[in-house]
Amino acid sequence: MFIAVVGLSHRTAPVEIRERLSIPEAEVGERIQQLRAHPHIEEAAILSTCNRLEVYIVTPEMESGVRQTMQFLAEAKGIPLPQLRPHLFTLLYQDAVTHLMRVAAGLDSLVLGEGQILSQVKKAQQLGQACNGMDRILNRLFKAAITAGKRIRTETGIGTGAMSISSAAVELALQEQGSLSQGKVTVVGAGKMARLLVQHLLAKGAVDITVVNRSLERAEALAKQFEQPIQVLPWESLLSSIAESNLVFTSTGATQPILTYEQLAGVLQPDQPLLLVDISVPRNIDPGVEKLRGVQVFNVDHLSRIVEENRAQRQKLALAAEALVEEEVEQFMEWWRSLETVPTISSLRHKVESIREQEMEKALSRLGKDFAEKHLEVIEALTRGIVNKILHDPMVQLRAQRDIEARRRAMQILQELFNLDPMPFQAQQER
């Protein structure tokens, strides 16, 4: 058997192609069944996100399995294969294993180290299991990838640190104020960036959030996107809301400053502490506001530096993460290579068990009908225990042998000594 992955991602395909090939969660089970219907695909799993579509397969015939998977992708979305092929990538053997582990760790993501992909890999495993698309090999692979993703995040911390302006704004506010659960937060604006601000604020513990926008309807629509209560105020209440806040974010499309020194000086108490974070371009807050005592102002340039510092830090952490990926890949490959021993071990166990059963029948026939049932159970347990004890060490040593040639010599010796005829099993090679 062989492992392969065929797919596309933000690295290989534009968004127009990714959109067309995206497979909704509700369709995944049906699509996996379509894949499994192909004669050379034994197992299948689909990982579909906004930035990637990847099909993982286990196949006895590598060339045929990959070809059938490519054809499936083309036919599923009605894209001619010659048009689709330039955007596809194919990884085989250990490269496919390494790829999934890097994906789960966020090392192949558009935002290096992002955490959402790990939950998406978990969901792909759940969907594959639910429709019986995954068996022993892909189940083990996805479990190993999820373990790798968790370990890398825990040991390297690669997922920490803001990587967007909105998250950096909230991270900065948290650093400056220590906690967001105390006091009032005002968000000025109701567009995409404002929504992200509210999302990050809630995630970091803010509980008293007010959204102010020129269009009250848009502000109300934003508030409805969250389960937590978000207060909404009309534009006329902007200054009064700011006067009651200790933290303000501005994110509007205004081409001129909406907050000036004169406006804030007229509503703030002397030396009133206030943190203003302006994520707009052009700036929403006039530079003169910084002259107010007790007021701190941060803009996009401050936030961009934070994002760049975090990005550079993640690049350093990625080196350590890659080393951990190699360790996890090698553990999986050891298990994968050990599957080559399964037919020999199974054949040996079957032969020894047959001998045990035959000898049990002979012994019982000599003991006669008066032999007690409880004695039979004891002898059954005794003989099975002897068989298991005898076979245990050879089986463990055979599976643990890392040298491929040495393991194959050991299997051949066992087959010759015990006259075994194991079923053919095509083991995965490292390359």
Swiss-Prot record:
Catalytic activity: (S)-4-amino-5-oxopentanoate + tRNA(Glu) + NADP(+) = L-glutamyl-tRNA(Glu) + NADPH + H(+)
Transmembrane feature ranges: none
GO biological process, one term: chlorophyll biosynthetic process
Pathway recorded for this protein: Porphyrin-containing compound metabolism; protoporphyrin-IX biosynthesis; 5-aminolevulinate from L-glutamyl-tRNA(Glu): step 1/2; Porphyrin-containing compound metabolism; chlorophyll biosynthesis
Residues the record marks as site: Important for activity: H99
Binding site for NADP(+): G189, A190, G191, K192, M193, A194
UniProt keyword annotations, A-Z: Chlorophyll biosynthesis, NADP, Oxidoreductase, Porphyrin biosynthesis
Active site, UniProt feature: C50 (nucleophile)
GO terms assigned for molecular function: glutamyl-tRNA reductase activity; NADP binding
Binding site residues for substrate: T49, C50, N51, R52, S109, E114, G115, Q116, Q120
CDD domains on file: NAD_bind_Glutamyl_tRNA_reduct (cd05213)
EC class name: oxidoreductase
EC number: 1.2.1.70
Domain writeup: Possesses an unusual extended V-shaped dimeric structure with each monomer consisting of three distinct domains arranged along a curved 'spinal' alpha-helix. The N-terminal catalytic domain specifically recognizes the glutamate moiety of the substrate. The second domain is the NADPH-binding domain, and the third C-terminal domain is responsible for dimerization.
Note: During catalysis, the active site Cys acts as a nucleophile attacking the alpha-carbonyl group of tRNA-bound glutamate with the formation of a thioester intermediate between enzyme and glutamate, and the concomitant release of tRNA(Glu). The thioester intermediate is finally reduced by direct hydride transfer from NADPH, to form the product GSA.
Assembly description: Homodimer.
Protein function: Catalyzes the NADPH-dependent reduction of glutamyl-tRNA(Glu) to glutamate 1-semialdehyde (GSA).
Family: Belongs to the glutamyl-tRNA reductase family.
NCBIfam families in UniProt: hemA (TIGR01035), PRK00045.1-3 (NF000744)
UniProt protein name: Glutamyl-tRNA reductase
Organism of this sequence: Synechococcus sp. (strain JA-3-3Ab) (Cyanobacteria bacterium Yellowstone A-Prime)
Name of the encoding gene: hemA
